A protein has these predicted regions:
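Alpha-helical transmembrane segments and terminal signal-anchor/GPI-anchor hydrophobic tails
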Residues: 16, 123-245, 292-305
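Transmembrane-helix motifs of polytopic, lipid-linked glycan transferases
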Residues: 36-52
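Short acidic/glycine- and proline-prone juxtamembrane loop motifs at membrane-interface regions
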Residues: 74-81
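Membrane-interface transmembrane helices that cradle and orient dolichyl/undecaprenyl
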Residues: 84-102
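Signature aromatic-anchored transmembrane alpha helix within multi-pass, membrane-resident enzymes
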Residues: 139-140, 265-287
Length: 305
């Protein structure tokens, strides 16, 4: 890629190779490229549910995926979407089988498409008997620090030191700043309450059905993943890029919801949860469309429906 532009050189080699292959297969029509890629990713996402023993409530989980992740990740953050899919469909299932070498291989493969996949290596500790009380305390602690902006200063200091030690170029520093400081006035993104509101139903599930979840290896694995995911969100909630980096662990939501649909104590409880969460997802998806399309020529069409 000697003659490639700066933007292409800044992409991971796996994504560049895949895009180049699609270019030779389909030509320069970007819509066909998106159609093929997203069809492939949706099929693999469905496979990932099966491979992770998620067999109940599949239609609702697909609705969850479409409303919560599809518009953003499968179009705007396509590289990370590919990496997330690789982690979900191959890496996590191999870890559940305790095949750690294969797990690490697929994490590295995912990182070739988007380097944030390396954070999924944290899953290596999620199959252990973690002390959930300490994790909850850590969540509360970092939540307070994030609200008071203390975590912001610490993370920026660490990043600056790391870049200094690595001798990174100014271009990388500018790109990183663009990811971290997302508002127009150069401030941190700030707290997104929806991130934590959507976690409330799952907090109920892991607390109410704790004994059943921890009675199986896979239940303990995804319960631990959920708590660590919330901890990471509490740490990174003021940094949009870092928050998105943690989304590999949102897969725990899919498992927990499928588990709940299957094990709900009553039909009324199941229906109430489905009603509340369905309405939340509808509001979330409409809000997201509003944010991204309101100022474009498509806004009239979208909101006229």
């Amino acid at each position: 890629y000697k003659d490639s532009s700066w933007e292409i050189r800044g992409q991971e080699i796996g994504y560049v190779f895949y895009s180049s292959l699609c270019y030779h297969l389909f030509g320069s029509n970007f819509n066909i490229y998106l159609l093929f890629t997203n069809f492939l990713l949706i099929v693999l996402f469905y496979k990932s549910l099966k491979y992770n023993e998620i067999r109940t409530g599949l239609l609702f989980i697909l609705f969850f995926f479409a409303a919560r992740l599809y518009l953003q990740y499968n179009f705007i953050l396509l590289r990370q979407s590919i990496a997330m899919t690789i982690v979900w469909v191959w890496a996590f299932p191999f870890l559940l089988k305790e095949e750690k070498i294969k797990f690490c291989f697929f994490i590295c493969l995912a990182a070739v498409f988007h380097y944030t996949a390396l954070i999924a290596l944290l899953a290596l500790v999620m199959n252990r008997n973690l002390n959930i009380k300490y994790i909850i305390i850590a969540i509360c602690f970092f939540f307070v620090l994030s609200i008071t902006k203390v975590v912001d200063k610490i993370l920026l200091l660490v990043i600056e030191r790391c870049l200094s030690v690595l001798g990174s170029s100014e271009g990388i520093g500018e790109k990183l700043s663009k990811y971290l400081l997302e508002s127009e006035d150069g401030e941190f993104r700030g707290l997104n309450l929806l991130t934590f509101i959507e976690a409330v139903p799952f907090i109920y599930i892991v607390r109410e059905y704790k004994s059943i979840l921890f009675s199986s290896f896979i239940g303990r694995f995804y319960t631990n993943m959920f708590y660590i995911f919330i901890l990471l969100l509490a740490i990174t909630m003021n940094f949009g890029f870092l928050t998105r980096m943690c989304q590999y662990f949102i897969f725990s939501y899919f498992f927990l919801f499928s588990f709940f649909i299957k094990n709900a104590k009553s039909i009324a409880e199941r229906r109430t949860m489905l009603f509340l969460f369905s309405n939340y997802l509808l509001i979330y998806s409409v809000r997201y469309i509003f944010i991204w399309f309101y100022s474009t020529e498509y806004s009239f069409f979208l909101f006229k429906l």
